């Protein structure tokens, strides 16, 4: 007996098979969305599958955001960042759903702890502690920070360390991506507690010269670098002294040389002899 092929029956079988594809779960990629700029977009790929892991091609998928103030999602699964915060995108097909967490971290400001800075003493140092925060006020732990000095002759920068080089004021800029934060830095000298002559010739002959060495000391007895001194002589007819502390013998006699620095002073006597 001859069997006849019935195309209507075949079509019914195909439709029945498709209708029997039950959605067991929804696979979402990426599993987590991370956004770092307002308006940044990431497209979610969602696929409904059966218990056997077979794709349900014509399954209807609906996307929804748990917080549209943080991130929105359109009907195709495109997620857009709005502001910093946490949200979740839910993909639903019938009674089955899946969630993809969304973390939006938009760097908004740099906070420098302890600013403005004052460095006391040449060579003194301070380590800068700065933090990048997003527009929700949360720390951005992955942010990288760089520092630069407007005047390296006053303050040098090594990594996050500031080093005093000369008396004065400058600015140090902390940078992270497009964010910048300037902080003023002042370098000053410690308070001078005493001034003393270190090198003084016992005598000078007329026509000879000598450099006087003077040191300023702090309350701890340590020498202070960078102190400027003013020199004077009690009698220029016997010996002169210039701004650098160079003494020149003029004629025989006794003279007093005075050095002043940081509101403190010291004196030393010098004898000038004939040639």
Region spans (language model):
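Sec-dependent bacterial lipoprotein signal peptides
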Residues: 1-18
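Extracytoplasmic soluble-region selector
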Residues: 3, 20-275
């Amino acid at each position: 007996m001859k069997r006849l092929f019935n195309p209507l029956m075949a079509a019914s079988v195909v439709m029945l098979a498709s209708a029997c594809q039950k959605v067991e779960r929804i696979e979402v990629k990426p599993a987590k969305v991370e956004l770092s700029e307002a308006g940044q977009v990431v497209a979610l790929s969602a696929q409904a599958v059966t218990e056997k892991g077979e794709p349900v091609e014509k399954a209807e998928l609906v996307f929804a955001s748990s917080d549209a103030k943080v991130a929105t999602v359109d009907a195709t699964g495109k997620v857009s960042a709005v502001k910093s915060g946490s949200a979740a995108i839910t993909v639903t097909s019938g009674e089955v759903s899946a969630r993809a967490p969304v973390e939006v971290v938009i760097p908004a400001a740099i906070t420098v702890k302890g600013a403005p800075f004052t460095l006391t003493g040449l060579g003194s140092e301070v380590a800068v502690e700065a933090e990048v925060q997003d527009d929700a006020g949360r720390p951005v732990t992955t942010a990288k920070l760089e520092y630069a000095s407007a005047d390296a002759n006053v303050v040098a920068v090594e990594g996050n360390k500031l080093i005093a080089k000369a008396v004065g004021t400058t600015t140090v800029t902390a940078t992270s991506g497009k964010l910048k934060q300037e902080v003023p830095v002042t370098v000053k000298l410690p308070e001078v507690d005493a001034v003393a002559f270190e090198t003084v010739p016992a005598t000078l002959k007329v026509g000879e010269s000598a450099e006087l060495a003077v040191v300023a000391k702090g309350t701890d007895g340590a020498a202070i670098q960078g102190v400027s001194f003013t020199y004077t002589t009690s009698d220029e007819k016997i010996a002169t002294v210039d701004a650098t502390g160079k003494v020149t013998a003029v004629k025989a006699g006794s003279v007093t040389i005075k050095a002043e620095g940081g509101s403190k002073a010291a004196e030393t006597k010098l004898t000038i002899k004939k040639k």
